[in-house]
Amino acid sequence: MTVKKVEIKVDINCGKCNSAIMEAVTEIEGVNHISLDEGNSILTVVGTMDPVCVATRLKKIKQKPVIISVGPPPKPPEPPKPPEPEKPKPPPAPEPPKHVCKPPYCNSCDVVSVTTYESGSGCTIL
């Protein structure tokens, strides 16, 4: 059998009626979930039970059930999808080196510096 949602209009006059309805319906085989809207006097039963069986059980406790609707149960809300992890960013381009490489050149073109020390005389005594 398939799971179905049954809505039944019942007479709720007091708290005793409320508990009698809940007890009668919970004894039915195949009932998964029961909710009772006291303001609108609507009993909602979800499960694989027969809706006529639910109405018959309510008649046995002196209720006048009216089946409002029979249909599939509401779909449970989908859990929110976890955020996708961000893709790793590609590494940044390497920075150019701080020193500048000179182009290669021939050894005959090397710059040579010559330093000379000239002092007035070769020997000094003080």
UniProtKB/Swiss-Prot annotation:
A lipid is attached at residue 123 (S-farnesyl cysteine). Residues 71-80 have a biased composition (Pro residues). It comes from the Eukaryota. The keyword Metal-binding applies. It holds the Pfam family HMA. The modification Cysteine methyl ester is found at residue 123. Keywords: Lipoprotein, Metal-binding, Methylation, Prenylation. The keyword Lipoprotein applies. SUPFAM superfamilies: HMA, heavy metal-associated domain. Residues 65-97 are annotated as: Disordered. A metal cation binds at residues 14, 17. One of its GO terms (molecular function) is metal ion binding. Induction: Up-regulated by cadmium. Residues 124-126 form a propeptide. InterPro entries: HIPP, HMA_dom, HMA_dom_sf. Residues 3-69 form the HMA domain. Belongs to the HIPP family. Heavy-metal-binding protein. This is Heavy metal-associated isoprenylated plant protein 43. It comes from Arabidopsis thaliana (Mouse-ear cress). The lineage of its organism: Eukaryota, Viridiplantae, Streptophyta, Embryophyta, Tracheophyta.
